[in-house]
Amino acid sequence: MESPQAKKSGLNLPAGMSTITSLRLETLSTPPSSASPRAISNLSSTPSPSKSSKCSDRFIPCRSSSRLHTFGLIDNQSPVKEGSNEAYNRLLKSELFGPDFASPSSSPAGCGVGSPLVSPSKNMLRFKTESCGPSSPFSPSIFGRNDGFCNEGFTPPKPPRKVPKTPHKVLDAPSLQDDFYLNLVDWSSQNTLAVGLGTCVYLWSASNSKVTKLCDLGPYDGVCSVQWTKEGSFISIGTNGGQVQIWDGTKCKKVRTMGGHQTRTGVLAWNSRILASGSRDRNILQHDMRVPSDFIGKLVGHKSEVCGLKWSCDDRELASGGNDNQLLVWNQHSQQPTLRLTEHTAAVKAIAWSPHQSNLLVSGGGTADRCIRFWNTTNGHQLNSVDTGSQVCNLAWSKNVNELVSTHGYSQNQIMVWKYPSLAKVATLTGHSMRVLYLAMSPDGQTIVTGAGDETLRFWNVFPSMKTPAPVKDTGLWSLGRTQIR
């Protein structure tokens, strides 16, 4: 039976609590419709008897036994750490959901746990390719990736150029001498290869593989050097007796014989009109085909045999190397060397001028030196050097790309291709069983031929073809280009 107090208060209380506790509600001054949870106050209980209750419908924790002080051990993150975490979160979102998701302007300021994973303004399906361009500093395109979002602007790195490791042609060259100081192979601008074999000079046409015997010097003489003119129609031959012979390569006819050297002429070099010859007599002679005298100039500076000669690309300077370990640079208007470079510690036979940069000269030393050195002939400073680990026999610069090739002796007898100015190795080619003493380049600049004492000539495809510039299109009469009236 309900107690009178319970019936009066309108509360349904358990039977056991009808006489134990009593609740008192204060009268509210505001109408019930506008009451808020805070309007109910002063819930108090009347003093309970000494007998405690055995059950209750609420659980009130004991604050005295709670370890509330442990929450104070959590340190607030520093602004620097919070900034780094924010940057990492934006970058991660950008990688996963695209660059627009990581943009601070595209995301609401109050983005919290309940925020959607995609922007409300974005559709789930995309029906067109979006334009490229990073919308935030955390866009993937800045870091070299743009997977699936903007592939048009991403350029993959170029793979390294592959150079064939084997020669595409091998020719027998019997009686090809194994002498470091001779220069017995040259390739003309008309695609004809000249080779000195013993007392004879042979011509091999790269166009039709036809072999022609140009001359035979006889049993008491020998071929020490060959060199084509720039036009490729005449060839000069240095002999063991010190003479220089000029031959017409098309008619196989001797044009002239010039003397002046006391002993063998081991190196020759043509510019537009002057032929320079170096000899074991330590002298360099300058010959002019237009005058009747044997030579027009004599350059004295080396203390031993001259074994390397090269004219610069503009025909203004002549570089000479000798067995005295010296590299000399001569001006065409002076009888004295303008530069005397003595850093090499062995004979300097390998010499080459860069066709891509004026006043850039490269030289290589013999067995005791093994270094390739780069020079600025304007001030005589050494720009760089690299130790190849073996005798440097020849050097040639590519006219198609900024690379050069070197041939070497003991112990690998290798051919090496270098990238300039990084001096990174592009390729290392092997095949000769003896030191690679002779080197020449084809007219198109793609193929080199190497010769060695193993009596073989090997042809290698080393350099790429020259890129032809795109023709300039005339946009009409009012174009900014030059027009011809008549």
From Swiss-Prot:
UniProt similarity note: Belongs to the WD repeat CDC20/Fizzy family.
UniProt motif (CSM motif) ranges: 87-98
Organism: Medicago truncatula
Biased composition (Polar residues): 27-36
Motif interval(s): C-box: 57-63
Keyword Cell division: yes
Factors inducing expression: Expression restricted to late G2-phase and M-phase during the cell cycle.
Short sequence motif named PEST motif, residue ranges: 24-36
Role this protein plays: Component of the anaphase promoting complex/cyclosome (APC/C), a cell cycle-regulated E3 ubiquitin-protein ligase complex that controls progression through mitosis and the G1 phase of the cell cycle.
PROSITE patterns cross-referenced by the UniProt entry: WD_REPEATS_1 (PS00678), WD_REPEATS_2 (PS50082), WD_REPEATS_REGION (PS50294)
Coiled coil segments of this chain: none
Gene Ontology CC: one annotated term: anaphase-promoting complex
Alphabetized Pfam families for the sequence: WD40_CDC20-Fz
Record protein name field: B-type cell cycle switch protein ccs52B
Gene3D superfamilies: YVTN repeat-like/Quinoprotein amine dehydrogenase
